[in-house]
Amino acid sequence: GHLLGSSSIEMWITEKGEECKIVFSGDIGNNNRPLIRDPQYIKEADYVVMESTYGDRLHGTPPDYAVELAKVLKDTFTRGGNLVIPAFYVGRTQEMLYFLRRIKTEHLLDEFEPFEVYVDSPLANEATTIFSEHKYDCFDEEAMELINKGITPISFP
């Protein structure tokens, strides 16, 4: 859900004949994010201990991030600029690569092709390799459809 390989821990404790369920988790994440499978929610627990960066927010329907990014790139390239996108090395970098692949393969910026993309982070490059190595375990249906067509979702021509 939240990150590649993330998980929650469920524990059942019995004390004085009473059983209770305790759940430990990091941020669970949102549905409909690219690449990795949607989170599996735990339906009930007696106690929950968790971290949540955005726990107090309701997320609406997300925009088409590839289209939004293409607009920013077009504006930047039109002005003769370069775009630097800071991103967490696990998760966000791979999502950005996914969106950039879509921009290139869906011809959203043909007038500026070819444009170069650099990932200037050894950790992000290593994490991207790990994503690719564990695609069958963690990628969602949309990403697997691309893989089955011979397309790597987080790289591009």
Task: Give the positions of each predicted feature.
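His/Asp/Glu-rich metal-coordinating catalytic cores
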Residues: G1-E95, R101-F112
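Hard-cation-handling environments
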Residues: V72-P157
